[in-house]
Amino acid sequence: MSTGKFIVIEGMEGAGKSSAIAVIESTLNKHGIEYINTREPGGTPLAESLRDMVKSVDHQEKLTVETELLLMYASRSQLLANKILPALAAGKWVIGDRHDLSSRAYQGGGRGFDETIMNTISDITLKGFRPDITLYLDIDPHIGLSRAKARGDLDRIELEKMEFFIRVHNKYRELAEQDDSIITVDAAQAMLKVHQDVEKAVIGFITNTDKG
C-alpha cells in the first residue's frame, strides 16, 4: 500500500480557503482518492484547546509572541502525530487548512519572530515533515480583511492592524517564490476562475503522482 499525500491550502483571511478546500475534496472524490481533513491550529481535541487559546479575544493577559508561536507548534505537533501521519501511513490523503507556512508568514513575517529560532522549533516538532504540495491563495490584505469583516466576528489575530497583515502578505509571497512545491493562485480573480485554477493544480499533482 502506498502512502498518502498531504495537500495544504494557505492564504490570508478572506482568501477563500474554505471554498477552495471544497474544490479539492470534489477533485479527489472524482479520482476515487480517500482523504481526511485537518485544520491548524486544531484538528485534535487537545490541539483544538490550543486553538482556542491562540484565537480567543477574551484573555485577561496579553499573549507574548513567544507564547503564540509555541502554542501554534504544540498544536501542529499534536495534529501531525495523532492524525496526519497515521492517515498518510494508511494510504489516505490529507487536506490541510494551513500548516507550517502559516507560522512562517504570521509569526515570522507579521510578528517578526527570529527565523533561526523558528527553524529550530520547527525541526524539533515536525522533524523535517513537509506537505507534498501547497496551494497558496494570494490576495491583497485590504481585500481579504474586508471579506473577513463581512463574515462577522473576528478572532484575536484577525483584529490586528493592517500593517501586520501587509507584513504577513509580503512574507507569504517571499516564501512562495522560494519553494517549488508551493503553487500560487490569484485569489482576487472571479471565484469560478480561482476554483478552476485550484482544480487544475490538484489534477496536475494527481497525474504526476500516478506517473511517479
Swiss-Prot record:
> Gene3D superfamilies given for it?
P-loop containing nucleotide triphosphate hydrolases (3.40.50.300)
Q: Which domain of life is it from?
A: Bacteria
GO terms classed as biological process? dTDP biosynthetic process; dTTP biosynthetic process; dUDP biosynthetic process
SUPFAM superfamilies, from UniProt? P-loop containing nucleoside triphosphate hydrolases
- Give the InterPro entries listed for this entry: P-loop_NTPase, Thymidylate_kin-like_dom, Thymidylate_kin_CS, Thymidylate_kinase
The molecular function terms of the Gene Ontology recorded here are:
ATP binding; dTMP kinase activity
Gene Ontology CC terms? cytosol
The residues the record assigns to binding ATP are G11, M12, E13, G14, A15, G16, K17, S18
Record EC number:
2.7.4.9
Q: What PROSITE patterns does this protein map onto?
A: THYMIDYLATE_KINASE
Enzymatic reactions: dTMP + ATP = dTDP + ADP
The record's keywords, sorted A to Z, are: ATP-binding, Kinase, Nucleotide biosynthesis, Nucleotide-binding, Transferase
Q: Does the keyword Nucleotide-binding apply?
A: yes
Record family assignment: Belongs to the thymidylate kinase family.
For this protein, the record's NCBIfam families field holds: DTMP_kinase
Functional summary from the UniProt entry: Phosphorylation of dTMP to form dTDP in both de novo and salvage pathways of dTTP synthesis.
* Name of this chain's protein: Thymidylate kinase
Q: Which organism is it from?
A: Colwellia psychrerythraea (strain 34H / ATCC BAA-681)
Q: What taxonomic classification does the UniProt entry list for its organism?
A: Bacteria, Pseudomonadati, Pseudomonadota, Gammaproteobacteria, Alteromonadales
